[in-house]
Each structure stands twice: as structure tokens, then as C-alpha cells.
Amino acid sequence: MNRSLYRTRIKFCGMTRAGDIRLAGELGVDAVGFIFAHGSPRRVAPAEARAMRQATAPMVDVVALFRNNSKEEVREVVRTVRPTLLQFHGEEDDAFCRSFNLPYLKAVPMGASGVNGEDANARTLQLAYPNTAGFLFDSHAPGEGGGTGKTFDWSRLPTGLHRPFLLAGGITADNVFDAIVATLPWGVDVSSGVELAPGIKDGHKMRKFVEEVRRADCHEMS
């Protein structure tokens, strides 16, 4: 399933500052993400995320990202932060992901040592995660976190998906136009591509990224 006509969704992930969240809303970003995965330099505590959530603009989704967290940890985040969407980057199965009664995205690792072209096919993914709201294809390898700043070969994306998909992994203002034109994603997910340092967003990069996404959308309309 491709995105709706000429409207690429934008998610800024790894948020750690309320000011960055406010700016994301002003720029028309569709979703902001908080990371709760152990070992991530962008990880925040549930109480911190709850406080920053107050800075989100109306109609902006709040996404909680996990990687092999326990069920208790996910429940605490759901209770404390009240996210609208969950995102799983680990070995979680469909039963685990859907057990929190919230829509979820399942990340698919596309790194050099990750899912190969044969395994990352639409049928396999959709049979494994029949209840996902969508897939997110990222450049990290299995067991690793996102935000690496590395891209992957976009031609390896599976075809024939019946769910929306987001593209992630090394996307910046310099390549997001080409990424959208090449893959026609439902949305794009960026973290390091709009940062000065892990978790510290750069206002100029954020603005430029959004501008390039909209330029790509206009290109698709022409």
C-alpha cells in the first residue's frame, strides 16, 4: 500500500527537548517519537516523556519506540506517557505487539547483516505481523537500534505490501527528495538527519527536511 495521494507523512524520532517538539508541530510534522529502548543515546524516562508530551501540537501523534523491552516496561510507558502509537524494533512477535491495545508499527532491519532480499518479502512480513498498522524499514541490523545515520539499498524494499510503510535510515534533507521519488513511502522517519548531536535537534535541518519532503510531494503531483 502506497501513501495517500501526494502526502508523505513525517515523523521526527528521538525527541529529548520540548522546544524541538514545539517546532516540529509548527512545521506540520505528523508524529514525534520518544525512545525507550535500552542502550539508545536518545533514551528518555517515562516521566520525562510525559512532561515533553505537553509540548505536542494538536493532531500530532506521539510514538513510543521499544527494542526488546519487557511487557512491564511497555505498560508503564503506555500508562504514563499515553502514546497514540507504538513502534517495535526488536524480536517482538505480533501477539506481544498487539497486547497493549494500541496500534503499532513493526520495524524491519535492512542492514548488511540484517534481513536479506529473500526474507524481507511482503507475504512473510504480513503473515508474521497481521495486526500491524504498518512497517518501518530501517538500515540497522537485527538487535541494533536506529539512528545510525546510514542508508540501505532502497531497491531491496519488498513489493506488494498491503500495509503502509515508512522509510528510515540515514535520511536527511539532502536525500529525502530522492528517497520519496524512488520508493513512494507512506511516511519518512528521521532522527540523526535533523540533529546536532544525539537527541539534540537542529531547527534549520528540521525546516529544510520538511521543505524537501513537500517538494517531493509537489513533484509527484506534476
UniProtKB/Swiss-Prot annotation:
GO biological process, one term: L-tryptophan biosynthetic process
A GO term, aspect molecular function: phosphoribosylanthranilate isomerase activity
Catalytically driven reaction(s): N-(5-phospho-beta-D-ribosyl)anthranilate = 1-(2-carboxyphenylamino)-1-deoxy-D-ribulose 5-phosphate
Pathway assigned to this chain's UniProt record: Amino-acid biosynthesis; L-tryptophan biosynthesis; L-tryptophan from chorismate: step 3/5
Keywords for the protein's UniProt record, in alphabetical order: Amino-acid biosynthesis, Aromatic amino acid biosynthesis, Isomerase, Tryptophan biosynthesis
EC number: 5.3.1.24
Gene3D superfamilies named among the record's database cross-references: Aldolase class I
Family indicated by similarity: Belongs to the TrpF family.
Official protein name in the record: N-(5'-phosphoribosyl)anthranilate isomerase
Native source organism of the sequence: Xanthomonas campestris pv. campestris (strain ATCC 33913 / DSM 3586 / NCPPB 528 / LMG 568 / P 25)
Encoding gene, per UniProt annotation: trpF
